[in-house]
A protein has these predicted regions:
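Short Cys/His-centered divalent metal-binding micro-motifs
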Residues: 102-133
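Nuclease and nuclease-like effector domains acting on nucleic acids or nucleotide cofactors
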Residues: 1-68, 125-127, 134-153, 157-179
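"Short basic amphipathic alpha-helical interaction patches in structured regions
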Residues: 86-92, 126-135
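A structural signal for short, well-ordered beta-strand segments and their strand-loop junctions
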Residues: 72, 111-115, 151
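Long, compositionally biased interface segments
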Residues: 180-186
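Short alpha-helix boundary/capping elements
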Residues: 44-49, 80-81, 118
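Charged, low-complexity, helix-prone segments enriched in Lys/Glu/Asp/Gln
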Residues: 13-22, 81, 100-107
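Histidine-centered nuclease catalytic patch
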Residues: 66-105
Length: 186
C-alpha cells in the first residue's frame, strides 16, 4: 500500500487556526504554556520534514556501515521556542497567514543526526509547562557539542552518496527566531 503524502499546508492551517483560537489564554497564570506551544510543535512534526541535505558525522558513519544504531531527523530550529515568539507577537504572526506560513515552513527544516546526539540536543531544553529554558541558542548548539556537519548528495543507498564537509553556516535559521531564543537562555 502506498502512503499518501502528508499535506504540510493542512498542518500549517491547523496550527495557525489553533493558535489564533487559543490566543486569549496566553499569559494567564492558570494556563499550562506547554499545552499551547505544543500545538505548533506537534503540527510542525506531524506535517513532515524539509531535509536540508545535512548530516552529522556520527549519523553518516551509522548510515555508511549499516549500523543497528539509529538516526533521526532533528528539527534543529526549536519550534517550541518559536511558538512563544508567535504568541507574544500575535499582531505580526497570527494576523497574516502568509507570515505565519513562512515561520512554519522554516521550522520544518531537519538535519540527519544520530539518536543519541538528538537526545543530547534535547537535554539543552527544559519545559515544565510554565518555564521554558534553553542553555544554548540553536545556531550554536551543534558547535557546543563539537559535531561535524556534512552535506550529502545523491539518492538510494547511503554508500552511493557523496559527502562534503560544511561549516555551521550551512544551517538555515530565521534571525527573528534566534533573537527570540536569547530570552530563554539561562
Amino acid at each position: 500500500m502506498t502512503r499518501k503524502p502528508k499535506p504540510p499546508d493542512e498542518y500549517c492551517v491547523t496550527a495557525f487556526n489553533s493558535m489564533r483560537a487559543n490566543l486569549y489564554r496566553w499569559g494567564k497564570p492558570e494556563t499550562d504554556i506547554r499545552s499551547m506551544t505544543r500545538q505548533y510543535y506537534v503540527n510542525i512534526h506531524d506535517s513532515g520534514k524539509d531535509n536540508i541535505m545535512l548530516i552529522i558525522e556520527k549519523a553518516m558513519k551509522y548510515k555508511l556501515s549499516s549500523s543497528k544504531k539509529t538516526t533521526t531527523d532533528d528539527h534543529y530550529t526549536r519550534p517550541q521556542a518559536q511558538a512563544y515568539m508567535i504568541y507574544d507577537n500575535p499582531d505580526k504572526y497570527l494576523s497574516s497567514y502568509d507570515v505565519f506560513k513562512k515561520i512554519f515552513f522554516d521550522a520544518r527544516k531537519t538535519i540527519v543526526v544520530a539518536k543519541e546526539e538528538n537526545d543530547l540536543f534535547r537535554n539543552d531544553t527544559t519545559n515544565d509547562g510554565y518555564n521554558f529554558n534553553i542553555k544554548t541558542r540553536s545556531d550554536k548548539l551543534y558547535q557546543k557539542h563539537g559535531v561535524k556537519l556534512y552535506r550529502y548528495s545523491g539518492s538510494g543507498k547511503w554508500t552511493n552518496r557523496t559527502f562534503t564537509p560544511v561549516s555551521y553556516d550551512d544551517m538555515i535559521f530565521n534571525d527573528e527566531a534566534l533573537l527570540n531564543e536569547e530570552r530563554f537562555i539561562n
